[in-house]
Amino acid sequence: MSDVTPGSGRLTHAPQDHPAVKRARIGVLLANLGTPDGTDYWSMRRYLNQFLSDKRVVDISDWIWQPLLQLVILSRRPFSSGANYRKIWNHERNESPLLTITRAQTAAIEQALLPVYGDAVMVDFAMRYGNPSTASKVRELVEAGCEKILFFPLYPHYAGATSATANDAFFAALTRERRQPAARVVAEYFDHPLYIEALAGSVERVYAGLDHRPDVLVTSYHGMPKRYLMQGDPYHCQCLKTSRLLRERLGWAPGSIDVSFQSVFGREEWLRPYTVEHVAALARAGKKRIAVVAPAFSADCIETLEEINGEIRESFLHAGGEVFTYIPCLNDEAAHVAALTQIIRSNLSGWIG
């Protein structure tokens, strides 16, 4: 028999002055990379400083890196980054598309879970960098009575610079709680059948609306230094498997899907081929019509809307390409929401029926 009087929020065997006890709930906290609060210099500087000071992102000694970051990079980069963000900014909501889309994903997933769990499970989202912060959202979930939290980094592929640092922020937030909730972390889902199905469906829908079939589909993944692969990061292998599974699901012949890597910065060797160079090489080789999809991004963001659909598109066309088709991220498409919801339900097993 419960020691809580139904509907009262009070323990039946507790002193009269005992604080009200919240009904136990389960929290699902989605997480993505992050977004600046605005496109102005100081908003961009705060965001970039937090991002580029993360040791999971740039693992150079602070004695070397911080003077360079604070005195050189952050005196210039916020201007160019702000200009790029302004090209894609959601001016109606005064926020980045990533924030808009992640909020929509959260609402859709919560609605999908409602018929199964009722209000026993609440869904929210956080950003690793910028707002809403992971710590603030963990606090809100605990305050709402969540005694268990399922943390879900929305990265299909594991990487130290994405999944691991998101987990770091979550675990750090838990250390601030007097009563820590039970916690679970959702693993990468790069080969989950429903994720592959959602990817394939998005490709098929876009291709069905084209006048001419692209000569090749480029799967462009966020890049990382090559030495991370050598040190044991599984990201590269997982990206290759996603592209292979996508090709097999589509029923296409080997060689019809390429793999490349984008968002390279610094002088260090990164995973190759670089997308911006690869699409130009395709154009010069006679592949005049290409399509590009970004399977590693669960939501459209600066790297897809501005980099792929801007810089990478221009590289292809400048090299003689004729038709460049960008296939949007899965965002809050029904098939994507269904995939994420199923992954959540599997990870809630044992916590709730």
Residue locations for each model-derived region?
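Active-site-proximal alpha-helix that buttresses catalytic centers in soluble enzyme cores
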Residues: 2-353
